[in-house]
A protein has these predicted regions:
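Alpha-helix-loop-beta-strand connector modules within alpha/beta enzyme cores
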Residues: 40-57, 112-115, 119, 344-352
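An alpha-helical appendage that flanks or caps ligand/catalytic pockets
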Residues: 102-145, 189-319
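Active-site mouth loops of central-metabolism enzymes
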Residues: 1-10, 60-68, 148-159, 213-216, ...
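N-terminal beta1-alpha1-beta2 module of alpha/beta enzyme domains
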Residues: 1-58, 152
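Conserved, mostly hydrophobic/aromatic
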Residues: 23, 46, 77, 116, ...
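Glycine-rich, proline-tolerant flexible connector loops at the mouths of alpha/beta enzymes
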Residues: 26-49, 61, 93-96, 178-181, ...
Length: 352
């Protein structure tokens, strides 16, 4: 099992180097331009201040930049950190919704992935922009502006069956979430469907999950203020995702959110309609909005987190590994990132 952290703040690159020293395997840079630092700047600095940790996006959003630009960006980072970069690609839940826009649809996203994949493989590919199609490829490779000689893995973000199938069809890996991406067996079944559609084998395919981890202190309960502060922002990020999903698709919310669902909708709908989309995602994986703390109940913590004492968390992680999970990512509140990553490294990773 590999473990990854998330670095999103341009002036705290030392956190990524610290995670490397603690034994973490990789680091994501997030791509939410209205609430975080620019991911490519973060990765460029991290590449120069680290030696072994793998670096990439979690996730680079298709709707924010042209596919050739995204391919160039990660290939440029690969020039600084050859052989230890990857690119995670996604349709853009938070990044697009903070602009009041929907995520990219699956069909254009699949085309986006196809172009990025071909360019990073050094291939010529037909590229369409504004209705005009031309063949394109990276040029002047001998001048070493970028590096595509060292392979760059493409991981596809997918919480639903179509995106998960697309990962199997075009990706080198899947990035999903627990629980909002469904169970691991369900996700893997979707991946295999996509691979079968493309006639691909899934050799070296990597499954990564964004997981909310919560380590309890001796005698601590799920109602403690420390617990709520530590896991609250991650739990509410999942709630925010579901609010948009249910609104747009009309599907029923999952059972695990039922205890707070209507109360949260009433709270959210009372916000100013013109800026509601901003308020919903402002705290995204960074801090717990004090007005939302009341929704972080023991029932919600149990539904959204791998929680327990170290030996209990280790047992649950091993169970996920047995189901086919290869890597775990987690995102800590900004003001606790050093303490939580250190504690997890010493009490969990070191014992696995």
């Amino acid at each position: 099992m590999e473990f990854g952290v998330t670095g999103a703040k341009i002036d705290e690159i030392g956190f990524i180097a610290h995670a490397e020293n603690l034994g973490y395997d990789y680091c994501w840079a997030t791509d939410s331009h209205l609430i975080r630092s620019n991911p490519w700047a973060v990765l460029a600095l991290a590449a120069q201040q680290t030696r072994t940790i793998k670096l990439g996006t979690g996730l680079a959003i298709g709707g924010l930049r042209l596919a050739p630009v995204a391919a160039n960006a990660i290939a440029t980072i690969n020039r600084l950190a050859p052989g230890r970069t990857f690119i995670g690609l996604g349709t853009g839940n938070t990044a697009m919704r903070t602009m009041g826009q929907p995520p990219m649809r699956i069909k254009p996203f699949a085309e986006y992935v196809r172009v990025v994949r071909a360019l990073l493989r050094g291939e010529e590919v037909d590229y369409t922009l504004d209705g005009t199609t031309h063949p394109i490829r990276f040029q002047n490779l001998d001048l070493k502006y970028i590096d595509i000689e060292h392979p760059i893995a493409i991981h596809i973000g997918g919480f639903g069956p179509r995106a998960q199938a697309l990962a199997g069809e075009l990706g080198d890996g899947l990035i999903t979430g627990i629980p909002r991406g469904g169970t691991l067996p369900e996700a893997l079944a979707n991946v295999r469907k996509g691979a079968a559609r493309a006639g691909r084998k899934l050799d070296n395919f990597k499954v990564t999950a964004l997981v909310n981890l919560l380590m309890l202190e001796p005698g601590e309960t799920l109602q403690s203020a420390r617990v709520i502060a530590e896991c609250g922002s991650a739990i509410m990020a999942n709630v925010h995702y579901l609010v948009d999903l249910v609104k747009e698709t009309g599907q029923e919310p999952p059972d695990y959110i039922a205890p707070i669902w209507q109360e949260y909708l009433d709270f959210h709908n009372a916000r100013d309609a013109a800026t509601r989309h901003q308020a919903l995602h402002a705290s995204h994986y960074s801090y717990l909005d004090p007005e939302e703390a009341r929704f972080v109940t023991p029932e919600m913590i149990k539904a959204f987190c791998i929680a327990g004492h170290p030996e209990e968390i280790i047992e649950q992680i091993r169970g996920l590994e047995d189901q086919g999970l290869d890597a775990i990512s987690f995102i800590t509140p900004l003001d606790q990132q050093y303490a939580i990553t250190e504690k997890f490294a010493h009490q969990i990773i070191a014992k696995l």
